C-alpha cells in the first residue's frame, strides 16, 4: 500500500510541476504545459491530457497513460506498458522508446509523427489516420500497421510478420523489412528504395507501385490488381501469379521459377534470364532468356501471351511432374 501511495504522490507532484511553454510542430494546438523527468505509474495517469510537452519521462506499469490525449509533444521518454496512445490526436514523439510490453501502443489515433525512435512493442498502429515515421526501428513489428490510412515511412527498419495489412494511401522511402505476408490487402501504395525479405508480400493488394527495390520471398503478389515494379530485383519461387494488370519495367528476376501463372494484363520487361515461366493467361513478357517456358493449352490460350525472347531453352506444353 505504501509503495502504491508513493507512486501516486509522485505522479501528482509531477503533474503539479507543469509550467507554461509553447512548442511549434505539426498542425495542432500549441502546448502550454510541461512535464519533465517524471516517473508515472498506475492506470491512465494522464488520461485526457491536452497541450502537454512531456520530456525525459517514464511511463511505467499502468495501462493507457495518454488515452484520449490531444496536442502532445513527447521527447526522450519511454512507454513500458500497454496501450499508451489510444484515441489520441495530434501527437509528436522524438527520441522515444516503446518497450516490448508497450504493445498495442497506438490504436484509433489520428495525426501522429514519430522520429528517431525505437519501438520494440508488437501490434502497433491499428485503425490510425495520418501516421508519419522517420528514422524509426520497429524491432518487433508483428501485426503492425493494420487498417490504417495515410501512412508515410522514411528511413524505417522493421522485423515481423503481417506488416501493413489492409492499410491504404501509403508512401515509403528507404525501408527495410524482414517478415512474411507484408502489405496483404494494402491499397494505393508507393514504395521507393526498399529491401524486403518477405514471403507472400503484396497479396490481395491494389494500386501498388514499387521503385528501385529488392524483394526476396516466394509467392510474391498473388491475387493483386494493378501491381507495378520499376527498376527492381526480385527472387521469388512461383511469384507474380494470379495478378490482374502486372507491369514490370527494367526488372531482374533472380532464380525465379514458375512465374506469371494465370496472371493477365502482363507487361513485363525483364533484364537477363527468367528461370521458368508457367501458363500466363494474357499479356506480354520480354526477357533476354527464358530457361523453361511452359504453355499448357488445356489450362490457358498460349496465343493470348506474347513472348519476346531470343533464347528459350526448353518449351513444354505440360508442367513437369512434381
What feature does the model see in each segment?
Residues 18-322:
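Long, distal/terminal scaffolding or interaction modules
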Residues 1-27:
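N-terminal amphipathic/basic-hydrophobic helices that include classical n-h-c signal peptides
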